[in-house]
Swiss-Prot record:
Name of the protein described by the UniProt record: Pentatricopeptide repeat-containing protein At2g04860
One biological process term in Gene Ontology: RNA modification
Chain ranges passing through the membrane: none
Keywords in alphabetical order: Repeat
Database matches in Pfam families: E_motif, PPR, PPR_2
């Protein structure tokens, strides 16, 4: 009978080296710490090569903790293996990988000898851990001591120069790369292209790109990204076409860069499907954001629903888009979904949702969002507080606006501007000027163009021409007259203060007036009783090729209303709908109904109200009732009054109008009846009292 001896596996250092190398490449699931402990339990003694491989394996492992790293360093010290520079370099890399920057710095300082590798390792580690300034300082010292940087070092330094706009420092890195021959390295060249594009040096980026002989996918993506960041859509598309023609592999980054350049998303979506990227969450998220930006919310929702993984960026994009459209009910549904998925909304996303709270009916939603900001800690962010200030301003809640402002630890100019603008929007211009004086007393801050525009709007409210002129002088001294929105505010201020000559002068001084500026001039003429000039201004605007918006037509219809230009009003109203595709608001309908009513065209006015796409409010019916009083049209007036009572029976002005209508026909019994009804509902009929 033959006896077979059991085979024993001979485990020498090479066996453990092989296991550790497998850890580096991710070929086995065992922890490097576990393998190293097995080695120590055997009779084998690790050498400096063992420690170098072990430290590299530990660097790539996600299961290492700071305590274990310190234990490894203790073992190195006891065994004397820490005298080898490359072993200490591996340990330094391990510290940096785990975010122990201070420990890495101490280890570097203790090293009696340093080679190029350890210098590069610490510089790259600083950069990866957010210590870019320290990385730059160390880079300077390294060059002074005669050591040469690696390609990885330069690649890690250039993003810092680009983000901070340090053009001269970035060019210095380029110079070092050229002298050392590292400029030929594709990674360095890509980093240089990205740096120059971030610093608005596209010419230099283009030269580097053209010089590249072997352009990889990363190189093409970098150039497309450079054009995208600069808003050059056509150039980004041209580079992509060249990339496509040369059969270069398209990556998810290619698609993301093109979408950020606002390239048409539908063809790119088709390309994503063809290239099999439909499961890439970053690509799907970018497409969702692109569809949301264009207002294609149905497509955005479907695409988001088809994704295998939820994305906070995609979801907040949909929420913000609905909020921007004013569909707060749907926005709240999606916002609730983020809470159910335990996603944390950031400050930018929350402010986007807050901007959607525009109507008084949104106050409960706005206060709930305020509560979320407090619970999540976002209320400490200046950006969020400014968003809340803007929101409460829309609700005319100036007290809360001032309270929020007082809670700010730091008050940058943007916060002062938010409060000043909020007070003006709420009809509290005097409070806005008090806040402005407080800002000037604090010192250190000077008003900018936005401050001046808000204060000019306050002057318009108060009809304070002298103060408006002082602000105009400040505008000229500080070259703010080049800002269209400041000039628009100046025109509005002069027009509302009755100085249409000066308003015209400001308007004529503008080289290229925008639509808002034309709107301000049209409204100014209308307010000043110059209705013919308002219509001429509108026609001139159209001749210049500018597209009127809904504000333009408010000014034009107001001019037609006050001037009694019925035919012109009808033409403009039709043009607004059919030619420019603008849906009339309640204000447009109120002006048009008032125009028809004043012209005794009551049948047309009623027909217009009946075919409205939106429910008429008291302002629309009130415009017709006022016309009935003027023309003593009792039958239509009573019909309109019944409609208004159904909408708001507590409206004291309605009782006064009905009383006046009956008085024009000497129907005194009805006057008494309406007056009694008014008193029964708590109104005395006095809308104002004079002390004279």
């Amino acid at each position: 009978m033959r006896i077979t001896k059991p085979i024993t596996l001979y485990r020498d250092l090479s066996y453990f080296h092989s296991l550790l190398k497998s850890c580096i490449h991710g070929e086995i699931s065992s922890s490097p710490i576990t393998i190293f402990r097995d080695l120590l339990r055997s009779s084998l003694t690790p050498n400096h090569f063992t420690m170098s491989i072990f430290l590299q394996a530990t660097t790539t492992s996600f299961n290492s903790f700071k305590l274990q790293v310190e234990q490894v360093q203790t073992h190195l010290t006891k065994s004397g293996l820490d005298r080898f520079v490359y072993v200490k370099t591996s340990l330094l890399n391990l510290y940096l990988k785990k975010g122990c920057v201070t420990s890495a710095q101490m280890l570097f300082d203790e090293m009696p000898e340093r080679d190029t590798v350890v210098w590069n390792a610490l510089i790259c580690g600083y950069s990866r851990n957010g210590y870019e300034c320290d990385a730059w300082k160390l880079f300077i010292v390294m060059l002074q001591q005669g050591f040469s940087p690696s390609a990885t070092t330069l690649v890690n330094l250039l993003p810092f120069c680009g983000q901070c706009g340090f053009v001269s420092q970035g060019r210095s890195v380029h110079g070092v790369a050229a002298k050392s021959g590292l400029e030929l390295d594709s990674q360095v060249k890509n980093a240089l292209i990205s740096f120059y594009s971030k610093c608005a040096e596209l010419g230099s980026a283009e030269v580097l790109f053209r010089e590249m002989k072997d352009k990889s996918t990363v190189s093409w993506n970098t150039m497309i990204g450079a054009y995208s960041q600069s808003g050059l859509q056509e150039e980004a598309i041209t580079v992509f076409k060249n990339m496509f023609e040369k059969n270069v592999e398209i990556s998810p980054v290619t698609i993301i860069n093109l979408l950020s350049a606002h390239v048409s998303h539908e063809p790119l979506h088709c390309l994503v499907v063809k290239c099999g990227m439909v499961n890439d969450i970053s690509v799907v998220t970018s497409l969702v954001c692109a569809y949301s930006r264009c207002g294609c919310l149905v497509s955005a929702e479907r695409l988001y629903a088809s994704a295998k993984q939820d994305s906070i960026v995609g979801l907040t994009s949909i929420v913000s888009c609905y909020a921007e459209k004013g569909d707060m009910d749907i926005a709240v549904v999606y916002f609730s979904k983020t809470r159910q998925l335990c996603m944390k909304i950031d400050a930018v996303a929350l402010v986007g949702i807050l901007h959607g709270c525009k109507k008084s009916s949104h106050i409960d939603i706005g206060m709930s969002l305020h509560g979320y900001a407090i619970k999540s800690g976002l209320c400490t962010k200046t950006l969020v507080v400014n968003g809340l200030i803007t929101m409460y301003s829309k609700f005319d809640d100036v007290e809360t606006v001032l309270f929020l402002f007082e809670q700010l630890q730091e008050t940058p100019l943007i916060s002062w501007n938010s409060v000043i603008s909020g007070c003006v929007q709420s009809g509290r211009a005097s409070t806005a000027f008090e806040v402005f004086h407080q800002m000037m007393l604090t010192g250190g801050l000077l008003p900018d163009a936005i401050t001046i525009a808000s204060l000019l709007a306050g002057c318009s409210q108060l009809c304070c021409l002298n103060l408006g002129k002082e602000l105009h002088g400040y505008t000229l001294r500080n070259n703010f007259e080049n800002e269209n929105f400041v000039c628009t505010a100046l025109i509005d201020m002069y027009a509302k203060c009755g100085n249409e000559v000066q308003a015209e002068s400001v308007f004529k001084s503008i080289k290229a007036p925008c639509t808002a500026t034309w709107n301000s001039m049209i409204s100014g003429y209308s307010l000043s009783g110059l209705q013919h000039r308002a219509l001429s201004c509108y026609l001139e605007m159209r001749e210049k090729g500018l597209k009127p918006d809904e504000i333009t037509f408010l000014g034009v219809l107001s001019a037609c209303n006050h001037g009694g230009f019925v035919d012109e009003g009808k033409i403009c109203f039709r043009a607004m709908i059919k030619e420019f595709g603008i849906s009339p608001t309640l204000q447009h309908y109120a002006l048009m109904v008032g125009l028809l009513g004043r012209a005794c065209l009551f049948t047309e006015a009623l027909y217009l109200i009946w075919k409205m796409d939106i429910k008429p409010d008291s302002a629309v019916w009130g415009a017709l009732l006022s016309a009935c009083i003027i023309h003593r049209e009792l039958e239509v007036g009573e019909y309109v009054a019944r409609k208004m009572f159904m909408l708001d029976y507590k409206n004291g002005g309605l009782y006064v109008l009905m009383s006046n209508l009956y008085a024009t026909e000497a129907m005194w019994d009805d006057v008494v009846r309406v007056r009694n009804m008014m008193k029964d509902n708590g109104y005395d009929g006095y809308l104002g009292v004079s002390q004279i």
